[in-house]
Amino acid sequence: MTDFTPDAILDATGLNCPEPVMMLHTHVRNLAAGGLLKVIATDPSTRRDIPKFCNFLGHELLQQQEEAGTYLYWIRKKAD
């Protein structure tokens, strides 16, 4: 478990590729630079897609974990 306190939470539960990453893009865009976003997803492809998204756009994936088929991600938006 982590003690990160997110500035925003994206609940993509029940959504399948490409919806979680599309929603992630919108949420990150609306987040202040350096802000922390927690993403909750159930699509296993997010294990591949979200780290690639962060790497490609320069955001920091602080942590990812799985809890009973739910995937959790903590993403720090890059500074402008």
UniProtKB/Swiss-Prot annotation:
Superkingdom of source: Bacteria
Pfam family, one: TusA
Cross-referenced InterPro entries: Sulphur_carrier_TusA, TusA-like, TusA-like_sf
GO molecular function: sulfur carrier activity
Keyword Cytoplasm appears in the UniProt entry: yes
Residue pairs linked by disulfide bridges in the UniProt entry: none
GO terms, biological process: tRNA wobble position uridine thiolation
Primary location: cytoplasm
Active site (record annotation): 17 (cysteine persulfide intermediate)
Subcellular localization, as worded in the UniProt entry: Cytoplasm
SUPFAM superfamilies membership: SirA-like
Keywords: Cytoplasm
An annotated GO cellular component: cytoplasm
Main function: Sulfur carrier protein which probably makes part of a sulfur-relay system.
Family stated for the protein in its record: Belongs to the sulfur carrier protein TusA family.
Protein name (Swiss-Prot/TrEMBL): Sulfur carrier protein TusA
Species, as recorded: Pseudomonas putida (strain W619)
Gene it is expressed from: tusA
